[in-house]
Amino acid sequence: MILFKVMHLEFEKELLEIKEKIDRLLGLYRLGKEEVLSELDELRKKFKEKARKIYRDLSPWERVQVARHPKRPHTSDYIKYLIKDFEEVHGDTCYGDDKAVIAGFGYFRGKPVAVVGHEKGKDTKEKLERNFGMPHPEGYRKAIKVFKLAERYNIPVITFIDTPGAFPGIGAEERGQSRAIAESMLTMAFLKVPSVAVVIGEGGSGGALAFGVANRVCILENAYYSVISPEGCAAILWKDQSKVKEAAKALRLTAKDLKELGVVDCVIPEPYGAAHWSPRGTAMMVGMTLKKCLDELSKLTEEGVVRSRLEKFKNMGAFKIAS
């Protein structure tokens, strides 16, 4: 509980206080004090109502903060909760193994699937090993390898998107960062097997889009998907980092905006208003959505899978013809 207290967001203070009371009463209940049960139920109800109200009215910038919450579930969590007998694939057969990308095969609801996702890491050591979820070219090449294996063995693909962006270092550029991203997008676009992408946290620019060219693109309600971060946008347009709130609003990067714009196909609700309060519950919601999408896509032929995916992306966007 102390760890979470350090990590809470400003607008979560009231929730944290209620959660601490719930934890204290749970401790007493486990010691045999059954008289606290009614008070415990009342506090749980109060927590749900307060959470629903707080997260329903968040601004775009506040949703970005929730998407970046350090306790938010990562790709590794969704694999743990949803994928059985997961076997990770390592290396890109060219340069090395990028730990910012998890890729491999396992079983989802009894059927084989390929899984690829960004991984930020949880503690300081792992975050450094995972490069804070910012892939190098070898991470994207590893993903491409898994995409092609999935196609060869007729296995559907699931991707989890959660990155501030591809790593912009000199070494990454020298090893072909932009080309690796482009090849990942191209490979996904023409895969002959069904694919579903889920934005679970940050969806930052091309680094995210590399795993986002799927038949179905879903997003958790507090995740975001954008061409640039609010901080980057504020620095470029306003030359002022303090304008992040205005930038977040202007970018229309929230799940609600993206659904209205047709960029994503569905918005997945988060239990208690935010995924970090219930990682397992969030995983179950994601699992139900994945099953629905994969069941729908399984009815398509190989040609239909590719055609529907290409049509989906061709139909995105809007333009106005000047008279």
From Swiss-Prot:
GO terms for cellular component: acetyl-CoA carboxylase complex. Keywords: ATP-binding, Cytoplasm, Fatty acid biosynthesis, Fatty acid metabolism, Lipid biosynthesis, Lipid metabolism, Nucleotide-binding, Transferase. It is found in: Cytoplasm. GO terms for biological process: fatty acid biosynthetic process; malonyl-CoA biosynthetic process. Its EC number is 2.1.3.15. One of its GO terms (molecular function) is carboxyl- or carbamoyltransferase activity. It holds the Pfam family ACCA. It comes from the Bacteria. It catalyses: N(6)-carboxybiotinyl-L-lysyl-[protein] + acetyl-CoA = N(6)-biotinyl-L-lysyl-[protein] + malonyl-CoA. Pathway: Lipid metabolism; malonyl-CoA biosynthesis; malonyl-CoA from acetyl-CoA: step 1/1. InterPro entries: Acetyl_CoA_COase_a_su, ClpP/crotonase-like_dom_sf, COA_CT_C. SUPFAM superfamilies: ClpP/crotonase. Residues 35-296 form the CoA carboxyltransferase C-terminal domain. Its main location: cytoplasm. Coiled coil: none annotated. Belongs to the AccA family. Component of the acetyl coenzyme A carboxylase (ACC) complex. First, biotin carboxylase catalyzes the carboxylation of biotin on its carrier protein (BCCP) and then the CO(2) group is transferred by the carboxyltransferase to acetyl-CoA to form malonyl-CoA. Acetyl-CoA carboxylase is a heterohexamer composed of biotin carboxyl carrier protein (AccB), biotin carboxylase (AccC) and two subunits each of ACCase subunit alpha (AccA) and ACCase subunit beta (AccD). This is Acetyl-coenzyme A carboxylase carboxyl transferase subunit alpha. It comes from Aquifex aeolicus (strain VF5). The gene is accA.
